């Protein structure tokens, strides 16, 4: 029997209907995939933002934790010298070409920092002085630098001299106390502090201990080689004395 025209048309169209269904399904599936990719990308961006925020919170937490530890270390010193104002700061840069280990702190004139401010460690040992002050940062010349000068005294013998740096000892993290008498009574392990003479540095800032005594080249005086109480080469946090 000959099939009715409608049946023939239905049979002929069947492959095309199947193809259309496949294409339609493929497009729908592809659209779902693109939509899914967009959702995943949006979720990734959200996660990235959340991770960045968490990382910043951790950085802030670490900074506050470090500052709290530093202030605790300084409490006993600050209680003895309440007239001094200490500003917490972190080392944010070092010049690799500086043979005397100068560094940059993250505090500047906007925080009250000024050139010639003394810089001390968390334990109160003299590290150096501010030589350049920008609005949000400052550069520190360490006690290892030959251009650094602070009036110092051996606390036990009261022998006076000048605390300064030396190219001969800087690489070992040592500074010197010059102009001691040739027959000085100063000995190894004696403590050296500042005198306050000149008004740049407060009196009685800890510097370090005498490691050895060597005659000055002319033979007229003695140099005390000092091991600083805190090594300026590796310090990461410091206090700037903004007033005293």
Predicted region positions:
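A secondary-structure micro-motif
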Residues: 1-28, 32, 39-42, 55, ...
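N-terminal helix-turn-helix
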Residues: 43-53
């Amino acid at each position: 029997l000959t099939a009715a025209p409608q049946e023939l048309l239905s049979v002929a169209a069947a492959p095309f209907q199947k193809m259309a269904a496949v294409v339609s399904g493929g497009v729908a599936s592809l659209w779902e995939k693109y939509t899914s990719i967009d959702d995943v990308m949006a979720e990734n961006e959200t996660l990235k933002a959340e991770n960045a925020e968490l990382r910043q919170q951790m950085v802030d937490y670490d900074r506050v934790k470090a500052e709290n530890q530093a202030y605790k270390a300084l409490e006993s010193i600050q209680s003895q010298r309440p007239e001094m104002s200490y500003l917490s700061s972190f080392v944010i840069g070092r010049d690799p070409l500086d043979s005397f280990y100068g560094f940059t702190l993250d505090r500047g004139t906007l925080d009250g920092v000024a050139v010639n401010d003394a810089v001390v460690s968390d334990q109160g040992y003299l590290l150096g002085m501010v030589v350049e002050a920008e609005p949000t940062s400052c550069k520190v010349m360490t006690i290892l630098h030959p251009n650094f000068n602070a009036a110092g005294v051996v606390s036990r013998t009261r022998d006076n001299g000048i605390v300064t740096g030396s190219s001969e000892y800087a690489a070992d993290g040592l500074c010197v106390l010059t102009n001691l008498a040739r027959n000085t009574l100063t000995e190894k392990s004696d403590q050296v502090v500042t005198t306050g003479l000149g008004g740049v540095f407060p009196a009685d800032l800890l510097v370090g201990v005498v490691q050895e005594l060597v005659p000055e080249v002319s033979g007229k005086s003695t140099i005390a080689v000092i091991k600083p109480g805190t090594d300026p080469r590796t310090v990461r946090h410091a206090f700037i004395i903004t007033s005293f």
